[in-house]
Design a protein with these regions (language model features):
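Noncatalytic, typically N-terminal accessory segments of nucleic acid-processing enzymes
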Residues: 2-211
Length: 211
């Protein structure tokens, strides 16, 4: 069974959001991918919610999953609702760009982990627990203040590489994807996700204004 990693999934989330801008369309792509990966033909919303967790590490409220199934996949004719269960139709398909984003994200993540492992091995005498290192890396990006076994060396690794544009871009995509994911889990209104709807007042010092 393939390893599930929230960070690579978060990076895909950010990439798809850039392309689509509608968060329900983005979640729908993850639903399509999970259905395709497990080759399931019949399911309900709860099973689909569990698929998103097992395949991508996403804990998404079932109500949101239901909305995506009804207003995206069913509306497009990709699935049919029969006796309370969804059945995959012949129109079901995963967007080619989405597939490319999934593949690119996983490759980018594995490259970062490989570089991180090599960095740790060059500075730590004892053998590296790769599984723990991955877990601590995820924990660090989710909450840098929470100390783990490899927190210090992970912070050093990021500091050493942060001036490299490609590396910084990959880390930014993961971090921004995690922010979107948090919004999906806890926002009462997904339609406002990524938008600033309230009045914003900006104060600029005259020294900067006329420079």
């Amino acid at each position: 069974m393939k390893e599930v990693n929230l960070l690579s999934s978060a990076a895909v989330l950010r990439a798809l959001y850039d392309n689509k801008k509608d968060i329900y369309d983005v979640i729908a792509e993850f639903i399509r991918a999970s259905i395709k990966q497990k080759s399931i033909r019949v399911f309900d919303s709860m099973e689909c919610t569990e698929l998103l967790l097992s395949e991508f590490g996403f804990r998404i409220p079932e109500a949101i999953v239901k909305s995506c199934l009804k207003n995206r996949l069913k509306k497009n004719g990709e699935i049919d609702l029969i006796d309370g269960r969804y059945c995959v139709s012949s129109k079901f398909s995963l967007n080619e760009q989405a597939e490319k984003d999934f593949s690119t994200s996983r490759n980018n993540y594995e490259k970062i982990i490989t570089e991180l492992t090599a960095y740790c091995e060059s500075r730590i005498i004892v053998p590296i627990d790769r599984s723990r290192l991955k877990s601590d890396f995820e924990a660090y990006l989710l909450n840098p203040e929470k100390a783990k076994e490899y927190t210090s060396i992970i912070a050093n690794f990021i500091l050493v590489n942060e001036e490299t544009p490609e590396f910084r871009s990959k880390i930014n995509q993961i971090e921004e994807g995690l922010i979107l994911y948090t919004g999906i889990r806890y926002s009462p209104n997904l339609s406002t996700l990524g938008h600033w709807s309230s009045e914003l007042t900006i104060f600029i010092d005259t020294e900067h204004l006329f420079n």
